[in-house]
Amino acid sequence: MAVSCPEVMYGAYYPYLYGRAGTSRSFYQYERFNQDLYSSSGVNLAASSSASGSSHSPCSPILPPSVSANAAAAVAAAAHNSAAAAVAVAANQASSSGGIGGGGLGGLGGLGGGPASGLLGSNVVPGSSSVGSVGLGMSPVLSGAAGHSLHSSHRTHAHSLAHAHTHPHSHTHTHTHQTKEEDLIVPRSEAEARLVGSQQHQHHNESSCSSGPDSPRHAHSHSHPLHGGGGATGGPSSAGGTGSGGGDGGGTGAIPKNLPALETPMGSGGGGLAGSGQGQAQYLSASCVVFTNYSGDTASQVDEHFSRALNYNNKDSKESSSPMSNRNFPPSFWNSNYVHPIPAPTHHQVSDLYGTATDTGYATDPWVPHAAHYGSYAHAAHAHAAHAHAYHHNMAQYGSLLRLPQQYASHGSRLHHDQQTAHALEYSSYPTMAGLEAQVAQVQESSKDLYWF
C-alpha cells in the first residue's frame, strides 16, 4: 500500500515534528516558564501562580506538600524584603560568635507593599540556638524548637527564596535564595549594601533554575544534615560554602561580591623601565619610544667601544698573518713566463731521444726529437701530426698513401713514447719521397681552407 500523504509518512518517523506522542516529548507539551514566580514588581503572585504540589515547571521551586501555592507565593514575595535584614543579622552574629544564635527573621514588609503585620516575625536572641516560631500571617505554618545550629564556617549563604523543610524530628533548615531576575529588576536595599561592604563573602546571583547536576551554574550542591541533631551545615566539604579560614571552600560558580582589588604598583621592585628613575624616554613616533637607562656621555662610550674592538682585531691579524713571500707558492705563481723543467725519463730509448733533441735546439717542439732521429719522411709525418689528426676522418681516401702513425694509434696511446717509437721505426728505412710530401702538404692546405673558415 503506497502512502502518499507526507504528514502520515513523516509523522511516523519524526513524531516530534507533528506533536505525536513518541519517545521524545514535544516542546509544547511542557508547561511554559512561569515568569511571575520570579518577579517581585508588585504583581499579585497568588493569582498568576500555576505551580501546585503535583505539577511544576522545570524552574519552579519544589516546596513541601504542606505549603500551598498561595503560601509559597507569599513567602516568595516577602523573601526579597526580608533577605537583606536577615543576612545582615546573620553576618553580624557569625562574625561575633561560633554559631548563629537565633536565626529568626523579623521586621518584614508585607505582600505587595502592604503593612508589616508580623509576617515571619520573631526576635533575635544572641545566646540561644533555636529558631523561633516562623509564622505566616497569624497562623503558624512552620514551627518547632530546633537544635539545628548554623556553624560559622558556612558564612551565611544569602539566598532569597525561603525553603523551609519540615521534619519529624522538628529540625528546621531555612535557606534564602535570590534569583537572577531579582538582581536585575529590584535595587538593593541599604542593609544589603552594608552587607556587601562587610568582610563576609556573600553568594548572590545564583538562580534556583539550574538545579541539574551537570548544569554550568550549579554551584551549590548542599548537603542538608536533617537527621543529625545539631549538625553543622556547610563546612569545608560544602561545595558552595566558604571555609573557616575565610577563603572559598571549593565553590565553582559562586562569585564573591567583594574580591580584593589587584593592585600592582608600577615601580615596585625596580622592574619597570620608567620606574627606575634613571631612564629617559624619547618618543620617536606615536608608537615608538626609546628608553635610555644610561646616565653619562654616550658618544664617548661608543667611540671607546669601537676603538677597542678595532684594536683587538688588528692585534689578532698581526699575530696570525704572514707575508706572501713566506708562503709556499710554486715558481709559476710569481713568473708567468716560467717553463716547468722536464723530468728525467726512465726509458733508455726516450732518454736518448730527449738528449738528441736538446742538442739540436728543438726543446719546445714535442715532435722534433722523434723526427731528428728518424729521417725526412718521419719528420714530415710528425711535424704535421696535429693537423693530420684533426682531419684524419676526411683523409680516409688517402689511407693507402698517407701511412701516418696517428691514424693507427688511439688517442691515449698516441702520446706514449714506446708506441710512437715503434711506428717511427717502421718508416725509418724508407727513402725520401718528395712527391708524397707535396701531396700531404696540398691535402692539409685544402683541409684548412675547408674547415677553418
Curated annotation (Swiss-Prot):
Superkingdom assignment: Eukaryota
Protein task: Involved in determining which thoracic imaginal disk cells will form wings and halteres, perhaps by interacting with other nuclear regulatory proteins. When in combination with scalloped (sd), it acts as a transcriptional activation complex that regulates gene expression in the wing. Binding to sd switches the DNA target selectivity of sd. Required and sufficient for cell proliferation at the dorsal/ventral (D/V) boundary of the wing imaginal disk. Also required for cell proliferation in the wing imaginal disk, mediated via activation of E2f.
Subunit structure: The Ser-rich protein domain within the C-terminal region interacts with the C-terminus of sd to form a complex which acts as a selector for wing development. Interacts with Dhfr.
Anything else known: Loss of vestigial function selectively eliminates wing and haltere formation.
PANTHER family: PROTEIN VESTIGIAL (PTHR15950:SF15), TRANSCRIPTION COFACTOR VESTIGIAL-LIKE PROTEIN (PTHR15950)
Region (Ser-rich sd binding domain): 279-335
Compartment annotation: Nucleus
Protein name per the record: Protein vestigial
Keywords (A to Z) from UniProt: Activator, Cell cycle, Developmental protein, DNA replication, DNA-binding, Nucleus, Transcription, Transcription regulation
Record region (Disordered): 145-279
Basic and acidic residues compositional bias, start-end: 178-193
One CC-aspect GO term: nucleus
Originating organism: Drosophila melanogaster (Fruit fly)
Gly residues bias spans: 227-253, 267-278
Cystine pairings recorded for this chain: none
Biased composition range(s): Basic residues: 151-177
Expression across tissues: Expressed in the developing wing primordia initially along the D/V wing boundary, and by the late third larval instar, maximal expression is seen in cells at the D/V wing disk boundary. Less expression is seen in cells located farther from this boundary.
Pfam families assigned to the protein according to its UniProt record, in alphabetical order: Vg_Tdu
A GO BP entry: wing disc dorsal/ventral pattern formation
Gene Ontology molecular functions: DNA binding; transcription coactivator activity
